[in-house]
UniProtKB/Swiss-Prot annotation:
The gene is vapB24. Keywords: Toxin-antitoxin system. It comes from Mycobacterium tuberculosis (strain CDC 1551 / Oshkosh). Possibly the antitoxin component of a type II toxin-antitoxin (TA) system. Its cognate toxin is VapC24 (Potential). This is Putative antitoxin VapB24. The lineage of its organism: Bacteria, Bacillati, Actinomycetota, Actinomycetes, Mycobacteriales.
Length: 77
């Protein structure tokens, strides 16, 4: 296990100590469980690979405006 130091805002520290007391845990256990929860919520992102390809395009259906009106529609304010 690695020992580390963190700086916490006063209110967060007081809340964490309260949770620890109410659930008969140490402050360290509260912090560990909180970090374990965050790691589950935010899974590891895979490293970018050299073989990345954009997603396959999907059919969006026919155009809703004719090609003749594209310029006019693009320049509407």
């Amino acid at each position: 296990m690695i020992r580390t130091q963190v700086q916490l805002p006063d209110e967060l520290y007081r809340d964490a100590k309260r949770v620890a007391h109410e659930h008969e845990m140490t402050l360290a256990e509260v912090v560990r469980r909180g970090l374990e929860h965050m790691v589950r919520i935010y899974p590891r992102r895979d490293a970018a690979s050299d073989t990345w390809q954009p997603p396959t395009p999907r059919r969006l259906g026919p155009f809703r405006a004719s090609e003749e009106t594209w310029r006019e529609l693009a320049n509407e304010a």
